A protein has these predicted regions:
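N-terminal export and membrane-targeting signals
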Residues: 1-12
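C-terminal subdomain of the subtilisin-like protease fold in secreted/lumenal serine endopeptidases
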Residues: 5, 36-37, 116, 120, ...
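Protease zymogen maturation seam
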Residues: 7, 15-58, 72-73, 288-307
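Subtilisin-like serine protease catalytic core
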Residues: 32, 48-80, 88-134, 146-151, ...
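Active-site donor-binding loop signature of nucleotide-sugar glycosyltransferases
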Residues: 41, 86, 123, 204, ...
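Solvent-exposed coil/turn segments that connect beta secondary-structure elements
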Residues: 44, 65-66, 207, 228
């Protein structure tokens, strides 16, 4: 069985998005991209991104197509990972999706958790496909070897598969896991691993708090996060690109989970998962499908900065 990336839609042009270093008060200005701006207050945009920690002691496991460790926005924080495509430790990114996810979660300019450590787990090939058994092996490796405190993000999805679901369920008992809801504009409960209730399944929104037009929905969607026209690092260079999709949204959630783990390193993974759902802004989104929770991702500390 072949699983594919939950595709993100690329804008026509690449972009360069250079951010100034965060000040001592931990506020990104310049301004930050809209996704970062949106998740640190309950309503609207204020052209700032506030964060209470840079999560330097948290590890983000990116189970995807690898990560471009040489991209300057990662600042040498990409640690040795594991390659389940060919065996060994080559986790370079020939697709670009994993680099982008890692950047939205944890890069200096584009990322939520700006100093988190990054470990690539390569399970997806250059064409965006991967064998289910190798994906499961990569997930199991993180379950068995995660350096705590840690979080994980997967950018994959496919037809229902009990074995894949079981692997993600076991991982979610060890680290908080962010999953894309998928981009078929249908019920996310039809797909694996997005239907795993122990993980955080994430739909996408735009800068106007509208649910993304292709975002999946349903009871298994735990919350929404920015996922339309979101910038992140481009593999094989020093700049960035703009992408859209629920993978982008899941990467935001992984970054916020890293912030939470940095502030509460001894809290168990399932409790972190619940905390992120509880922190979400409720009933601020439009276009939410009936039967889907109207929750928007928020960073820890947002309640002190009500917008």
């Amino acid at each position: 069985m072949i699983i594919r990336l939950v595709r993100v839609m690329a804008a026509l042009a690449l972009l360069v998005f250079a951010a100034q270093p965060a000040s001592a008060t931990e506020v990104q200005q310049n301004p930050p991209n809209w996704g970062l701006d949106r998740i640190d207050q309950r309503t609207g945009l204020d052209q700032l991104y506030h964060y209470d920690t840079d999560a330097k002691d948290v590890t983000v496991y990116v189970i995807d197509s690898g990560v471009d460790a040489a991209h300057p926005d990662f600042g040498g924080r990409v640690k040795p990972g594991k390659d389940f495509l060919n065996g060994g430790t080559d986790t370079s990114d020939t697709n670009g999706h994993g680099t982008y996810l890692a950047g939205v979660a944890a890069s200096k300019s584009y990322g939520v958790a700006k100093a988190a450590q990054i470990v690539p787990v390569r399970v997806i090939d250059a064409q965006g496909g991967g064998a289910t058994d190798k994906i499961i092996a990569g997930i199991d490796w993180v379950t068995q070897n995660a350096h705590q405190p840690a979080v994980a993000v997967l950018g994959i999805g496919g037809t229902a598969n009990d074995q894949l679901d079981a692997a993600v369920r076991a991982l979610a008992a060890v680290v908080p896991v962010a999953l894309p809801a998928g981009g078929e504009a249908t019920d996310a409960g039809q797909f694996s691993p997005g239907r795993v209730t122990e993980a955080l399944t994430v739909g996408s929104t735009d800068a106007s708090d509208q649910v993304g037009s292709t975002s999946n929905y349903g009871e298994v969607v735990d919350l929404f996060a920015p996922g339309v026209d979101v910038p992140g690092p481009n593999a094989g260079g020093s700049g960035g690109r703009m992408l859209s999709g629920t993978s982008s949204a899941a990467a935001h959630v992984a970054g916020v989970a890293a912030l939470y783990r940095a502030l509460h390193p001894d809290v168990a993974a399932p409790d972190v998962t619940k905390a992120l759902v509880d922190l979400a802004a409720v009933d601020v989104l439009t276009g939410v499908h009936q039967g889907t929770a109207n929750r928007l991702l928020q960073t820890p500390g947002t309640q002190l900065r009500r917008g």
